[in-house]
Amino acid sequence: MAKAASTRPRRKERKNISSGVAHVLASFNNTMVTISDAQGNAISWSSAGSQGFKGSRKSTPYAAQVAAEDAGRKAREHGMETLEIEVSGPGAGRESALRALQTIGFSITAIRDLTPIPHNGCRPRKRRRV
């Protein structure tokens, strides 16, 4: 008979990475922050939804700030000190996520805006009438 797998939780090893890239995706509905090493391997991540915000509260700047602080704290545990920031998307959490990463104590070397802009591509969705 096969041996049962142990139920003891596996301890996450501490990586020693000094610099990395913070990818901030700020959509209209949520803000996601992923911090990776230079090769693109994810070190930590967080989103407004994973921090307990639901519905329209996920798209607020405060929710983006909380998500960025959480992802940044996890990355600091792995020894990360310098960051390049890549921001994409039109959401409200762009600036506040960037500011939150600065206040944690990261030294920011570059900020890039990677928001995709169509050169007259697909037809956009209809305008909202509220």
Curated annotation (Swiss-Prot):
Q: Which GO terms describe its biological process?
A: translation
For this UniProt record, the keywords arranged alphabetically read as follows: Ribonucleoprotein, Ribosomal protein, RNA-binding, rRNA-binding
Q: Which InterPro entries match?
A: Ribosomal_uS11, Ribosomal_uS11_bac-type, Ribosomal_uS11_CS, Ribosomal_uS11_sf
Question: From the UniProt record, which GO molecular function terms apply?
Answer: rRNA binding; structural constituent of ribosome
User: What GO terms fall under cellular component here?
Assistant: ribonucleoprotein complex; ribosome
The subunit structure is: Part of the 30S ribosomal subunit. Interacts with proteins S7 and S18. Binds to IF-3.
Q: Which purpose does this protein serve, as stated in its record?
A: Located on the platform of the 30S subunit, it bridges several disparate RNA helices of the 16S rRNA. Forms part of the Shine-Dalgarno cleft in the 70S ribosome.
The entry's family comment says: Belongs to the universal ribosomal protein uS11 family.
Q: Which NCBIfam families match?
A: PRK05309.1, uS11_bact
What is the official name of this protein in its record? Small ribosomal subunit protein uS11
Species source reads: Acidiphilium cryptum (strain JF-5)
Its lineage opens with: Bacteria, Pseudomonadati, Pseudomonadota, Alphaproteobacteria, Acetobacterales
User: Which gene underlies this protein?
Assistant: rpsK
